[in-house]
Amino acid sequence: MLDKKQWDDFRASSRSPYHYWGEDAAQSGAQYIVELGGRSIGKSYFWRALMLNDWFLNGAKMAYIRRYGEDITPAKVAQYFAGVDWGKLTDGRFDGVVCKAGQITAVKRDDKRKVIDSALVGYYFAIALDEHYKSSDYPEVQWAIFEEFVTRGRYLPDESDRLQNLISTIVRDNACTCVMIGNTITRACPYFAEWSLTHVPRMVAGDVDIYHVGDTVIRVDMCAAAMDAPKKSSKMFFGKSKKMVAQNEWHSDTFAKCPVNPYAESRVLHTIYFNDANITMRVEVRRSDYGDAFVWVTPVDFKFTRLDKVRVVSRQLTSLSPYHQSTFRPLCPAEGFILTAVEQGKIYYCDNLTGTDFNTIFLTLCTTPKLK
């Protein structure tokens, strides 16, 4: 970790008044630092710059982590470091980076592009390839950065446990800080539930939560820029995308409004609950007074037990009850209609954020999702 003078120099050379600055988080002593926020506030910039400064000044190696193997090709890893001014960072000792065979190496080239000096910066890993890294040695790794850990696509099976096992493989019994960078694209993320980060869905810009899980400290920051950016901000973002990119709000898609009043002009035929990542959705198959069937989705604050005789799909609920499933498999025609409703656009939500969360949850819990 940087000492006081190194922090002063780093702050003077790198800090922008318009972007996120995570010095408090870096000095918090947490083993896991979860950084959430919009795409344009500088989360990755700060942490990458900090880790590279700590490497050059103190020899601290870093581990760059992604979810899938296709995300850590040498070209993609090199692109991640493409914006680094290696000459400025290293006082002219190095001028570029080479990524191959799982290693990130700073290099100095002569006029003929021949490498004349090099130094190991760190390593890169994919959680999906975790079995490949066992029995290998990665000395002096003190930082790990997991980029884009929040996704609207599929997570790996037991991903949060596999991440911890990968960190254990990398650092063994040594001290390490793992920084997890995520954009506010969905609140339905298994890490939030499995690590009991219960307040994350309700966090707003500037909030900081500290969780203690056994001997491990997890710090969660809903990152905010230091101050409002100048009015020359990009005109390429508008609507819901601007709220997430520029205004640091949870992203939500836009969905069709229910053509009838679901409570005054329809009746419930069947109810099922979907639960994942600390979010529960009540899904009702309804028939309108005009004859058409549709699906109505609302969020609920409901805690299930193994004894509840309600229809529940949840990975967190282990039970032998026929009412409970860990993945959604229709048990009756009404539940089969839910799949049809998704395909035909006959599913409606009480608000857009509910629809966004349900799409992520349904994709996770359904064996054959066909969301549009």
Indicate where each model-derived feature is located:
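Phosphate/NTP-binding elements of NTP-utilizing enzymes
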Residues: 2-372
